[in-house]
């Protein structure tokens, strides 16, 4: 029925807040910080590299930072989806 797509987030820093509307053509705007002038844009994983290059060429964009959450080690105590490791105690 529905297929889960890999999506990622880009943090786009702007010179002016009025330019945040222009980012809606690149993906889904999730959050806009008016005080710190950045926008979180979610998009499909396969479009990220091309979109970063396009956004860096735009005059209203200061900086583009991709999300690194996929690269972090999420195997820690308290994580519900971690791989079960054999217990040392018993």
Swiss-Prot record:
Q: Which Pfam families match?
A: DUF2129
**Keyword Cytoplasm set for record:** yes
Instruction: Show the stretches that span the lipid bilayer.
Output: none
Q: Which GO terms describe its cellular component?
A: cytoplasm
Where does it reside?
A: Cytoplasm
Q: Which UniProt keywords apply?
A: Cytoplasm
Which family is this sequence assigned to?
Answer: Belongs to the UPF0298 family.
Enumerate the NCBIfam families for this protein: PRK02302.1
Name used for this protein in its record: UPF0298 protein SSU98_1559
Organism name: Streptococcus suis (strain 98HAH33)
